[in-house]
């Protein structure tokens, strides 16, 4: 997808093509001051690559004629239009077929089944597209699905002035159900940076990012600002948790583990020293690994990428877990529907470190592991 995005950008203008290198260079200077490009670790290069892709995609949107030009090529747009759940035209056709059938008094279940099958077949492609090309799903698929959904909400009186409207409340309900499901799927499963790229490449939003022309430094700053935002789901006091940062597992890790357990069933806790996971809720089939990372150590402040590496290691362990038994408690992969990591970090975590945390969260999604972050102050 990186190559697809950059190719669109480079086709828009020679300037944007050459600007991609500057985007990366500026990102390196902002995130890793004093570090030469040749000295970047592989994971640091991945971070820069992601930022450059977001920024370059945004730049492409500024030089192109539409949001789609920033995200995907014309062919991918064509494919999306031809292969989507129920589009505007499909919704109208379904509405007409169902309305005519009801008026004739026939058995209309075959019509409903036919269109549900079409919707399901086209919707099934979204799962793979969210893995292979999430930016296309955000830019084009979402708009087509939304078009079909919006058709159900057009008031009937518009039909009196020549505007096409749906007339069957039954058909509207089906389209809302089918397309609403796909819209939710796209929103929930799209990587966060693609949502930023779509937002930033919209002409109505570009005024906030560009003044007097294409300003590469502003675009890069915007991308970094988005990626480095604080995404903690909660903030708690250290005294409430009973933990002390930098004081070892007994005063940092264990108190946090106990705190997380307060919101889980009493029998969810696994035996001490259980492999990978600390809790298992049989009712929800959720296995939870409780972790805490002190981001304020000299090593992690000097090299924020260590934060990503630590979380990634925890994610990989949770994703690859197969089975384990200890003290009469057994846990197997077949018992697990949800794998989660409850992560605690200091409230003083830097923006650069947050960029690494957010990258790890997105990586977790790709591995089927949900990472929830709580900051402890």
UniProtKB/Swiss-Prot annotation:
Residue numbers covered by motif VENN CT cleavage motif: 81-84
The enzyme's E.C. designation: 3.1.-.-
Residue spans crossing the bilayer: none
Chain spans, region CT domain, sufficient to interact with CdiI: 88-377
Entry binding sites for Zn(2+): 257, 278
Keyword Membrane on entry: no
Region (Has DNase activity in vivo, cannot be expressed in the absence of CdiI): 222-377
Subcellular location, principal: cytoplasm
Cofactor notes: Bind 1 Zn(2+) per subunit.
Catalytic center residues: 257, 278, 289, 291
Keywords annotated in UniProt: Hydrolase, Metal-binding, Nuclease, Target cell cytoplasm, Toxin, Virulence, Zinc
Compartment(s) of residence: Target cell, Target cell cytoplasm
Gene Ontology terms for molecular function: deoxyribonuclease I activity; metal ion binding; toxin activity
InterPro entries recorded: CdiA_EC869-like, CdiA_helical, VENN_dom
Subunit structure and binding partners: Interacts with cognate immunity protein CdiI-o11-EC869, which blocks its toxic DNase activity.
Name this protein carries in UniProt: Deoxyribonuclease CdiA-o11
Originating organism: Escherichia coli O157:H7 (strain EC869)
